């Protein structure tokens, strides 16, 4: 009866994937998986070597708040609206050895991690994963790299990048407070970074980046340099030493649930050949 109830609610595919992989990774949405992978690769974290295209992830973000018939069918198919605990417990009734990890957004609410039991849920201390790499300097460098540096409009384009970015920082981060914005701009690099992190800890920086790319496209013409869902491409432009230690801690958690990949000689990768 438990098997029938679980399969009816979550769908057989959820059970099959959990049985094959031995774990479930709970994230807000598909872009989180892309960002975690990009961060792992940028940091050279060991978990990057275990990554494959069959990540068993479950998206907990409820994209369908209105419970019409279509939304309800979508919820049952994809699991939207079900908490990680409900989903994991339903599957673990069938798979007692199942491991679970949730890496979820804080959303500015000081959510507390849960580390006891087979399902561990950790929250980003900042608003979301994007808050660990999106900065004005990064957006400026990325945008500049996407336009010709040696044509007649190069200086005009750079001016547009700076002005769009400054206007956005002033309004979205400093709430229009010109004096505070000026202090941030004139601060040393270290002080500027600390102030940026403090001011944006509870702000959704993915939205900030999307607004920047939209504003820039309107200003200089042409298409968006990056669309929603492509922000993980920015990670390649981040100096590894600038990525907070917390990111590595989250990746360490991920390494604990990912299965060890076997080399062609049958030796676990990263463990060496037994003596």
Named regions from a protein language model:
Residues 191-245:
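C-terminal structured domain segments
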Residues 1-101, 106-110:
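RecA-like P-loop NTPase motor core
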Residues 40-44, 87-92, 216, 235-238, ...:
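Hydrophobic, Leu/Ile/Phe/Ala-enriched alpha-helical segments that form helix-helix packing faces
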Residues 170, 174, 222-226, 240, ...:
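Intrinsically disordered or highly flexible coil/loop and linker segments, enriched in small
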Residues 2-6, 14, 35, 86, ...:
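Exposed alpha-helical structural elements
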Residues 97-203:
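Activity-critical C-terminal alpha-helical subdomain
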Residues 1-17, 244-275:
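Switch/communication elements of ASCE P-loop NTPase nucleotide-binding domains
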């Amino acid at each position: 009866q438990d098997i029938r109830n679980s399969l009816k609610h979550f769908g057989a595919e959820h059970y099959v994937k959990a049985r094959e992989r031995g774990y479930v990774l709970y994230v807000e949405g598909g872009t989180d998986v892309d960002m975690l992978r990009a961060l792992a690769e940028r940091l050279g974290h060991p978990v990057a070597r275990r990554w494959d295209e069959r990540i068993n992830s479950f998206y907990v973000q409820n994209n369908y708040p209105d419970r019409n018939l279509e939304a309800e069918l979508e919820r049952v198919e994809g699991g939207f609206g079900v908490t990680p605990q409900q989903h994991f417990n339903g599957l673990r009734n069938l798979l007692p050895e199942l491991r679970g990890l949730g890496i979820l957004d804080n959303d500015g609410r000081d959510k507390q991690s849960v580390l006891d039991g087979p399902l561990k849920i950790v929250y980003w201390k900042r608003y979301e994963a994007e808050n660990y790499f999106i900065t004005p300097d990064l957006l400026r460098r990325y945008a500049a790299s996407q336009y010709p540096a040696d044509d007649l409009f190069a200086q005009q384009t750079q001016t547009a990048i700076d002005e769009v970015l400054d206007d956005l920082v002033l309004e979205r981060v400093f709430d229009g407070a010109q004096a505070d914005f000026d202090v941030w701009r004139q601060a040393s690099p270290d002080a500027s970074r600390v102030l940026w992190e403090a001011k944006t800890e509870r702000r959704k920086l993915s939205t900030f980046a999307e607004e920047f790319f939209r504003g820039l496209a309107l200003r200089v013409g042409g298409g968006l340099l990056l669309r929603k869902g492509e922000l993980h491409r920015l990670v390649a432009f981040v100096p590894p030493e600038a990525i907070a230690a917390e990111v590595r801690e989250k990746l360490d958690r991920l390494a604990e649930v990912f299965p060890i990949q076997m080399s062609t000689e049958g030796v676990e990768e990263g463990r060496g050949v037994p003596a």
